[in-house]
Amino acid sequence: MSIAYISHDKCQLHDMGAYHPEQPARLSAINDRLIATGLDMVLRRHDANPATPEQLLRAHDDTYVDMVFAKSPQQGQVSLDGDTSMNPHSLEAALLAAGAAVQG
């Protein structure tokens, strides 16, 4: 038996700082736990492909998708709402994470 594990190293670049729960350490902790439990032996690792706009629109309305793309910063950080912030790598990381869900 094998289990698909779909992710991408670029997701580690969505780093909103130590104060924010969305940080690369969470992905590292998941990988460490998979290794510690031996589950990594049955994983088939795959790099995620980014979700397409059409795939995003299956879960989000076009106004929201357009807003996220428009607010993606070239530098620094921007806040989309009280819980969601973006850095220059966040859009790509989000597209890869959504793509992983579609692939899975």
Segments from the language model and where they lie:
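HDAC/HDAC-like amidohydrolase catalytic core signature
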Residues: 1-104
